[in-house]
Structure formats: structure tokens, C-alpha cells
């Protein structure tokens, strides 16, 4: 039997669509239904590698976790990863399909993307009872309606009723609801069966006159008002959210994360914020590095451009100097920057051909145009450099990188048991020399024992008692947040529209 579908759209970006889908997946999974999330087309720099070695957005990974199932590339058949010059890398069914600008994508590739979307939707519908679909941005972008691949076009394709989520925290919620509905044509508007007001703070009685009036004006019921809950700790999808999290956590241990202009997979740093005495600070142009206990250089969608940014802003020399005193850790593109040289023979990232790296690790990275490495990975810590006390410890992560790295007179960080690491033939990953280390493994700090060892090293250097390897606050908080999110929605939203769909 083919699954029933419900779709969550928003009056704007960041209205709360992703978390609403996660909540509905959790709620109906707990009620015994086989539920799967779906987002036809996502634009995000935070991605993940599935067990199929396919790349999808992290939002769909969270939603799959909420549904109690393994993530699949069919849950996000088209992923757009912004690059330079208004182009994006287009990922279809978890594999790169090329770099395209908006015009080329719409005129030459749209039909291919739509076919992939249709195929994945049918795949999920044949295997589950309920598909919870997430839209993108707003359905009322009337200049884009005929090119839509994420909102009403998908609602019609899936024959899905739509719940519209509106963010009251940013102001103008009733205008955004009325404006969205007014701008939709009758065929699209008829799909919307209810509105949810999200991120409300205060006494709901004050809101009731507005709710009654907006229902009169639009003829669409308000299904619920969801309170703002600052206690929820869930991964962010957009880099725009970084501006709201310059400082995270409180404590004596200060970890600086370089806010690269083209930062990607910044969820790599999330687990550090759950170490009880660690303060994570995003380092932007003009900030000082003087009071830090460690520096992390994260992933980037353009290693060479962001390396040049560090040089031009004086950060490169500061990092070189501080590496004598404190740990410097690079992930993916950040690891590539730590080496002596980056050779871009294929001119993938720059017309420069090659540039000098930070010179903190004796290695070179080569971009040869051979294609992207996408893999779930596992390795064992070799116990070199600052990780001498972790020898033999198993870590897991995932790889999403172009370029391979050749080591000189420097020790690798990991022996690779599954995946690729520094080269396409596997063997070893990363490098470590004294205080400096790097890896291609995204998610390495999601490994509790690795993270606790790293932060304990920082504690000991400051004369602070190290913490025991007991409770993984990050994993526990994530599970709690998903459950709490589901409870908030269940307590504050009329779910009868979905119940009727399932019973019909």
C-alpha cells in the first residue's frame, strides 16, 4: 500500500520546518507507524554520508533519527552545495552531478532533478506508511513558482496536504501568514489545511485575538502555537545561524573555531559545546586568538580561498606562532591548510595552480579532478603526537572531500579500517606533529572518548582536574531534545489533520 503524505512548508526560511518534520516523525513513529522524512531539494553546506556512502543534508539525518530509521539518499534526492561565483555543486541521489549556476540548473538540469525526486518519493512511499515532507524557504516566491522543485510542485506530486509554519519570534507573523496565502494561486492555496505559529514567548491569551482574526481573513485554521524552548540542542542547517552562536558554552577551557568565509560542516564542532567546562568561540576577522587553549580550523567549500583569507587577515601567522603552545586541529579543508603546500593541478579551486599552506605539517594536498570521496569511515588512533594516550582507540566519522594528501616526514593520525583517508587507496588518515593534528574524518569529535581525551588534554595543561569517561552529554542531549521537541508539538498542536489522513 502506498504511503500517505503530509508536507510542512514555511512562511520564510528558518521558520521551523526542519524541526517540525523531525517532531512529526518522532510522534507518529512512537505511535507505531512506519514514518520517513523527505526533502526533494535542499540547499545546505552541512551534509552527512549515509551507510550507502551517499551524501545528504544533515537535517534529513536528524529527521531519520527521529523516525527511528537509517538515513537514505532517497530522503534528500537533490542537494545543492553553494560554491563560488553563484554556482553550486549539485548532488543527485547522493553523488555529485556537476557544478552549475542557477540558469544552467533550471534550463538544462531541472527535468533530471525532477525525475530523481519522483523516483525517490515513489521509493519511500512503497516502503513506509507516512512520508513527512519538508519544503524550502517560502512557497510564495511568485517569481520562482514555475521553477519550483521544493514546495507546491512537490505537494501536488505527492498529493500532500500542507501545514504552514510561521515564525513569530522575528515579528510580523500575521502579515506573513496572510501574505503567503494571498500570493498563492487557488490550486496551491487549497493544499494548505492549517497554520502553526512557532517560537512564541509569553502569554498565549494576548495572541488569541490575532489568531481569531487571521482565521477569519484567510479561512485557514491555526492548528497550534509552539513555545520557544531554548533548551533544545539540535544541529543547525544554515551557516546564517552561526551569527547567533558566536559564543557557546561557559567554562575555563576556551576553544576557538575559525569562522571561515566558506565554512562547511560546522556541526563538527557541536559536541565540544557539551563539555561542561568548555567555551567554544567562533573567531571572526578582528578577533584576538591570545586567550585560547586550542584552535580548530573546520571544513570549507574552498580550501585555497579560505587559506588566503587567513593569510590576508593575519590569522595565519598567529596560528603558526600559537601552535608552539596550544593544540591546532584541522578537519578536512582545515587539515589541508595545515600542510606545506596545496597543488591545484586541475584548477578546481583557484587559478593560482598552487599555494603555500600554513606549513605546520609536513604534507602536500593535490587536487587532481578525480572526483569527490564520499564515505562512512572508521579508523584507529595510532597514538602519535598529542594523542599518544589514545593508541588503539576506534573512531568513526565520514568523508566528503576532494583532493588527496601525501605525507612527508610526519606521522599519520589514524589507521583507516573503513573509508579512504589521505589517499584513494586507504591506509592512513590525517597527520600529527607535536601540538598540530588534522583529519579528513568529519564528525571526529562526535566520538565521546576522542573528544573527552582532547578536552582533558586542555584541562591538564591549565591545571584543571580531567573529567572521567562516563556520560556522553552530547548524545544524551540530542536524544532528549528530539523527544522534548515531539512532546512540545504533541501538547500544543492539533494533530487531527494528520490522524485523519492516516485513517482515510
Curated annotation (Swiss-Prot):
Pathway: Cofactor biosynthesis; adenosylcobalamin biosynthesis
Stretches assigned to the GATase cobBQ-type domain: 252-450
InterPro entries recorded: Class_I_gatase-like (IPR029062), CobQ/CobB/MinD/ParA_Nub-bd_dom (IPR002586), CobQ_GATase1 (IPR033949), CobQ_N (IPR047045), CobQ_synth (IPR004459), GATase_3 (IPR011698), P-loop_NTPase (IPR027417)
Source organism superkingdom: Archaea
UniProt-recorded Gene Ontology molecular function terms: ABC-type vitamin B12 transporter activity; catalytic activity
Active site per database record: 332, 442
Family per record: Belongs to the CobB/CobQ family. CobQ subfamily.
Known function: Catalyzes amidations at positions B, D, E, and G on adenosylcobyrinic A,C-diamide. NH(2) groups are provided by glutamine, and one molecule of ATP is hydrogenolyzed for each amidation.
Name this polypeptide is given: Probable cobyric acid synthase
Naturally occurring in which organism (per UniProt): Methanothermobacter thermautotrophicus (strain ATCC 29096 / DSM 1053 / JCM 10044 / NBRC 100330 / Delta H)
Amino acid at each position: 500500500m502506498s504511503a500517505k503524505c503530509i508536507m510542512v512548508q514555511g512562511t520564510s526560511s528558518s521558520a521551523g520546518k526542519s524541526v517540525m518534520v523531525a517532531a512529526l516523525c518522532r510522534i507518529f513513529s512512537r505511535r507505531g507507524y512506519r514514518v520517513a522524512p523527505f526533502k526533494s531539494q535542499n540547499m545546505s553546506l552541512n551534509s552527512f554520508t549515509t551507510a550507502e556512502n551517499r551524501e545528504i543534508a544533515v537535517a534529513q539525518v536528524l529527521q531519520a533519527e527521529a523516525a527511528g530509521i537509517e538515513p537514505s539518499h532517497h530522503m534528500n534526492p537533490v542537494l545543492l552545495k553553494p560554491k563560488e561565483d553563484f554556482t553550486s555543486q549539485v548532488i543527485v541521489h547522493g553523488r555529485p552531478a556537476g557544478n552549475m549556476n542557477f540558469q544552467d540548473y533550471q534550463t538544462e538540469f531541472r527535468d533530471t532533478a525532477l525525475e530523481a525526486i519522483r523516483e525517490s518519493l515513489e521509493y519511500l512511499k512503497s516502503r513506509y506508511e507516512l512520508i513527512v515532507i519538508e519544503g524550502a524557504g517560502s512557497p510564495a516566491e511568485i517569481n520562482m513558482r514555475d521553477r519550483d522543485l521544493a514546495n507546491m510542485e512537490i505537494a501536488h506530486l505527492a498529493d500532500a496536504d500542507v501545514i504552514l509554519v510561521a515564525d513569530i519570534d522575528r515579528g510580523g507573523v500575521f502579515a506573513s501568514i496572510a501574505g503567503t496565502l494571498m500570493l498563492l494561486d487557488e490550486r496551491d492555496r487549497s493544499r494548505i489545511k492549517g497554520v502553526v505559529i512557532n517560537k512564541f514567548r509569553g502569554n498565549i491569551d494576548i495572541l488569541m485575538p490575532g489568531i481569531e482574526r487571521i482565521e477569519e481573513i484567510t479561512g485557514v485554521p491555526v492548528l497550534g502555537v509552539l513555545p520557544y524552548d531554548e533548551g533544545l540542542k539540535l544541529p543547525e542547517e544554515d551557516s546564517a545561524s552561526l551569527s547567533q552562536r558566536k559564543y557557546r558554552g561557559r567554562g575555563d577551557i576556551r576553544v576557538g573555531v575559525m569562522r571561515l568565509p566558506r565554512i562547511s560542516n560546522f556541526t563538527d564542532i557541536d559536541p565540544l559545546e557539551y563539555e561542561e567546562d568548555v567555551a567554544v568561540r567562533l573567531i571572526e576577522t578582528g578577533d584576538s586568538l591570545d586567550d585560547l587553549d586550542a584552535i580548530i580550523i573546520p571544513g570549507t567549500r574552498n580550501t585555497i580561498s579560505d587559506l588566503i583569507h587567513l593569510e590576508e587577515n593575519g590569522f595565519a601567522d598567529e596560528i603558526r606562532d600559537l601552535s608552539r603552545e596550544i593544540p591546532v586541529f584541522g578537519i578536512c579543508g582545515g587539515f589541508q591548510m595545515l600542510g606545506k603546500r596545496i597543488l591545484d593541478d586541475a584548477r578546481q579551486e583557484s587559478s593560482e595552480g598552487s599555494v603555500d599552506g600554513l606549513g605546520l605539517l609536513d604534507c602536500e594536498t593535490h587536487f587532481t579532478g578525480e572526483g569527490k570521496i564520499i564515505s562512512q569511515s572508521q579508523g584507529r588512533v595510532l597514538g602519535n603526537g598529542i594523542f599518544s594516550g589514545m593508541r588503539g582507540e576506534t573512531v568513526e566519522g565520514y568523508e566528503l572531500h576532494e583532493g588527496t594528501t601525501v605525507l612527508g616526514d610526519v606521522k599519520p593520525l589514524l589507521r583507516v579500517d573503513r573509508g579512504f583517508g589521505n589517499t584513494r587507496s586507504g591506509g592512513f588518515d590525517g597527520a600529527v606533529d607535536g601540538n598540530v593534528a588534522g583529519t579528513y574524518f568529519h564528525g571526529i569529535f562526535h566520538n565521546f572518548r576522542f573528544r573527552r581525551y582532547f578536552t582533558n588534554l586542555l584541562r591538564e595543561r591549565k591545571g584543571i582536574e580531567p573529567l572521567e569517561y562516563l556520560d556522553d552529554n552530547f548524545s544524551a542531549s540530542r536524544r532528549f531534545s528530539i523527544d522534548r521537541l515531539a512532546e512540545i508539538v504533541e501538547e500544543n498542536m492539533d494533530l487531527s489533520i494528520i490522524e485523519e489522513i492516516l485513517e482515510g
